[in-house]
């Protein structure tokens, strides 16, 4: 499957500006900058399990089926309902405060999150 794999954080753009726009306090933004994030994606057709492990042992995991409403949670643990879509090979989700697209480009997982005119990009390299 196109998305299945384990990915390790490699680089990011506009982290500070995006996190400030989310309303996170400075100390939380600073701590998050040093996180080593491992993303693991399991894809079975239209069904996904998308997990992110953060330094310190915190894990966020969302299960969803493309085109069907599901309950998801944000990095902060807030639960919300969303319908995840597939558009042009990209997984597209509307989080409560931002729009996110994810795609695999070569051996990289590229995640783009947008709030208004601020775009955050996180790139992770495939480990397995």
Curated annotation (Swiss-Prot):
N-acetylalanine modified-residue sites: 2
Pfam families the record matches: Lipocalin_7
Source organism: Mus musculus
GO MF, any single term: lipid binding
GO-annotated cellular components: cytoplasm; membrane
Tissue specificity statement from the Swiss-Prot or TrEMBL entry: Expressed in ovary granulosa and luteal cells.
Gene name tied to this protein: Fabp6
InterPro entries: Calycin (IPR012674), Fatty_acid-bd (IPR000463), ILBP (IPR031259)
Family to which the UniProt record says this protein belongs: Belongs to the calycin superfamily. Fatty-acid binding protein (FABP) family.
Job description of the protein: Binds to bile acids and is involved in enterohepatic bile acid metabolism. Required for efficient apical to basolateral transport of conjugated bile acids in ileal enterocytes. Stimulates gastric acid and pepsinogen secretion.
Keyword line: Acetylation, Cytoplasm, Lipid transport, Lipid-binding, Membrane, Transport
Subcellular location: Cytoplasm; Membrane
Protein name, per record: Gastrotropin
Principal subcellular localisation of the protein: cytoplasm
Membrane topology field: Peripheral membrane protein
An example Gene Ontology biological process: bile acid metabolic process
Entries under SUPFAM superfamilies matching the protein: Lipocalins
Domain note: Forms a beta-barrel structure that accommodates hydrophobic ligands in its interior. Can bind at least two ligands per molecule, however, the stoichiometry is debated.
């Amino acid at each position: 499957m196109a998305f299945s794999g384990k990915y390790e954080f490699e680089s990011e753009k506009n982290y500070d500006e995006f996190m400030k726009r989310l309303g996170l306090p400075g100390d939380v933004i600073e701590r998050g900058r040093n996180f080593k994030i491992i993303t693991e994606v399991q894809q079975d057709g239209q069904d996904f399990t998308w997990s992110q492990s953060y330094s310190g042992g915190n894990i966020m995991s969302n299960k969803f089926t493309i085109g069907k409403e599901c309950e998801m949670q944000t990095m902060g643990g807030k639960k919300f309902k969303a319908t995840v879509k597939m558009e042009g090979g990209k997984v597209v989700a509307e989080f409560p405060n931002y729009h996110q697209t994810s795609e695999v480009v070569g051996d990289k997982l590229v995640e783009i999150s947008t709030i208004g005119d601020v775009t955050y990009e996180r790139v992770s390299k495939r480990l397995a």
